[in-house]
């Protein structure tokens, strides 16, 4: 039996992407998850239990964060095994981190077939954006969901989790009924910039995909 108030619905979520893209910053925004995280020494991983309250009851994502070991090459299969969903993160101010997204996707689906995956472009609060909406096409080719996010400003923090929860529960009408306590914003996302980026993404969605054979 789950303890009183303990979510019975939980999912293993793996968070992958190049080092320095903001994965740890992102997961640490959720304050109770940061407070209750556990370190798995055998895999060199921190597991953050992120609880979200929905109209279908509480849902917990046990978010596996690599603690930086991706800087030394790929991750071991033990990190991916039994993952039920994933977030792949890149940094919109660094083109190389987007170029590496197909490698992360390949490693992930080699171990975890057919799990829901969200692609997130982080650091959209920074004015010097290099990876624009029109060049982010990988998710369309692989049937992933995409969101612009800004971990430091909390912009769109909940979006990847809501999309994954709807997929995993099988209810497109699932909603979060309360937002989790998040760390105060370290930067402010310019509302005009956010509106522009949302418009750019809508336009990009309706643009034909390029014909080239490579993965990006």
Swiss-Prot record:
Keyword flag Magnesium: yes
Stretches for region Switch-I: 37-45
Cross-link (Glycyl lysine isopeptide (Lys-Gly) (interchain with G-Cter in ubiquitin)): 71
Result of changing residue 39 to A: Abolishes steric hindrance that traps the essential Q-69 in an unreactive position, and causes slow GTP hydrolysis in wild-type. Loss of one hydrogen bond with the gamma phosphate group of bound GTP
PTM annotation (Phosphothreonine): residues: 24
First-listed, main subcellular location of the protein, grouped into a coarse class: nucleus
GO cellular component terms, semicolon-separated: centriole; chromatin; cytoplasm; cytosol; extracellular exosome; male germ cell nucleus; manchette; melanosome
Broad enzyme group: hydrolase
Record-listed E.C. numbers: 3.6.5.-
Cofactor: Mg(2+)
Site (Essential for GTP hydrolysis): 69
GO biological process per UniProt: actin cytoskeleton organization; cell division; cellular response to mineralocorticoid stimulus; DNA metabolic process; GTP metabolic process; hippocampus development; mitotic cell cycle; mitotic sister chromatid segregation
Pfam families per record: Ras
Region annotation Interaction with RANBP1: where it falls in the sequence: 211-216
Quaternary structure note: Monomer. Interacts with RANGAP1, which promotes RAN-mediated GTP hydrolysis. Interacts with KPNB1. Interaction with KPNB1 inhibits RANGAP1-mediated stimulation of GTPase activity. Interacts with RCC1 which promotes the exchange of RAN-bound GDP by GTP. Interaction with KPNB1 inhibits RCC1-mediated exchange of RAN-bound GDP by GTP. Interacts (GTP-bound form) with TNPO1; the interaction is direct. Interacts (GTP-bound form) with TNPO3; the interaction is direct. Interacts with KPNB1 and with TNPO1; both inhibit RAN GTPase activity. (Microbial infection) In case of HIV-1 infection, found in a complex with HIV-1 Rev, RNAs containing a Rev response element (RRE) and XPO1.
Protein function: GTPase involved in nucleocytoplasmic transport, participating both to the import and the export from the nucleus of proteins and RNAs. Switches between a cytoplasmic GDP- and a nuclear GTP-bound state by nucleotide exchange and GTP hydrolysis. Nuclear import receptors such as importin beta bind their substrates only in the absence of GTP-bound RAN and release them upon direct interaction with GTP-bound RAN, while export receptors behave in the opposite way.
NCBIfam families associated with the record: small_GTP
Name the UniProt record assigns to this protein: GTP-binding nuclear protein Ran
Source organism: Homo sapiens
Gene from which the chain derives: RAN
């Amino acid at each position: 039996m789950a303890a009183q108030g303990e979510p019975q619905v939980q999912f293993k979520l793996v968070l992958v992407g190049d080092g320095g893209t903001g994965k740890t910053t992102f997961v640490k925004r959720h304050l109770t998850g940061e407070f209750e995280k556990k370190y798995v020494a055998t895999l060199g991983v921190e597991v953050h239990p992120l609880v979200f309250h929905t109209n279908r009851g509480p849902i917990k994502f046990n978010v596996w964060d690599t603690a930086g070991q991706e800087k030394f090459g790929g991750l071991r299969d033990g990190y991916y095994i039994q993952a039920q969903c994933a977030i792949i993160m890149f940094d919109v101010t660094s083109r190389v981190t987007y170029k590496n997204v197909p490698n992360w996707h390949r490693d992930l689906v080699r171990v975890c077939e057919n799990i829901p995956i969200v692609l997130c472009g982080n650091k959209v609060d920074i004015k010097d954006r290099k990876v624009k909406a029109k060049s982010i096409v990988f998710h369309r080719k692989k049937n992933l969901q995409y969101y612009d996010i800004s971990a430091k400003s909390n912009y769109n923090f909940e979006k990847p989790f809501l999309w994954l929860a709807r997929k995993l529960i099988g209810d497109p009408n699932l909603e979060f009924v309360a937002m989790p306590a998040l760390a105060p914003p370290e930067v402010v996302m310019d509302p005009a910039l956010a509106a522009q980026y949302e418009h750019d993404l809508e336009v990009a969605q309706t643009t034909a995909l390029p014909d080239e054979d490579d993965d990006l």
